[in-house]
Amino acid sequence: MFIVVEGGEGAGKTQFTQALSKRLMEEGKEVVLTREPGGSALGEQLRDLVLDVTQEISSYAELLLFLAARAQHIQEKILPALESGKTVICDRFHDSTIVYQGIAGGLGEAFVTDLCYRVVGDEPFLPDITFLLDLPEKEGLLRKTRQKNLDRFEQKPTSFHRAAREGFISLAERSPDRYKILDALLPTEVSVDQALLQIRALI
């Protein structure tokens, strides 16, 4: 099973994915926990580049860097894990690119979606289920400001993050069979319990 966790800055995706992975392993599942951008040696190098606040990267170059990292990630890590029967949990995937670069970033949802869906062939490679950790953008940014070092996206204006939140919600509402919205203001363990109910329903 391929599980993706999406959400804006400060939504608690890392904590959630780690807790969900632990619970699934306790149930006897073999779990691969990964992230985007990243997940491979090349992907992690591209992650460092694209999040670096000292870099001035054009919108299209930024998009292509994310797609390059994803293509390598899918082929090197995600597909082999799924083919061996493991459960893959990924912190961000296509929809983060569609939202951040396409909707909030202004490149266009349809254009970015088409590229994302062709990153490893003619057929879109999609997760079995996507959890959206949703919270008001101001709350997410407040959580992030408690950190010392903010990356290029965390430093973007509130208007960008508001558009991103609206974009995620729009995608979720249009794909209710795949998407499940979780309240990121709730304790992580509560959200994980809710997610496990949804996952078990698919097994």
UniProtKB/Swiss-Prot annotation:
UniProt record, GO biological process: dTDP biosynthetic process; dTTP biosynthetic process; dUDP biosynthetic process
Q: What GO CC terms are in its UniProt record? A: cytosol
Keyword Nucleotide-binding present in the record's keywords: the answer is: yes
Q: Which UniProt keywords apply?
A: ATP-binding, Kinase, Nucleotide biosynthesis, Nucleotide-binding, Transferase
| Catalyzed reactions per annotation | dTMP + ATP = dTDP + ADP
Please list the GO terms describing molecular function: ATP binding; dTMP kinase activity
Q: What is its EC number?
A: 2.7.4.9
Q: Into which family does the record put it?
A: Belongs to the thymidylate kinase family.
Does this entry carry the keyword Transferase? Answer: yes
Family matches, as Pfam families? Thymidylate_kin
Origin: domain of life:
Bacteria
What is the stated purpose of this protein?
Phosphorylation of dTMP to form dTDP in both de novo and salvage pathways of dTTP synthesis.
- Which SUPFAM superfamilies does the entry mention? P-loop containing nucleoside triphosphate hydrolases
Which organism was this protein described from? Answer: Chlamydia muridarum (strain MoPn / Nigg)
Tell me the InterPro entries matching this sequence: P-loop_NTPase, Thymidylate_kin-like_dom, Thymidylate_kin_CS, Thymidylate_kinase
Query: What's the top EC group for this one?
Result: transferase
* Xref: PROSITE patterns: THYMIDYLATE_KINASE
Q: Where does ATP bind?
A: 7-14
Quote the protein name from its UniProt record. Answer: Thymidylate kinase
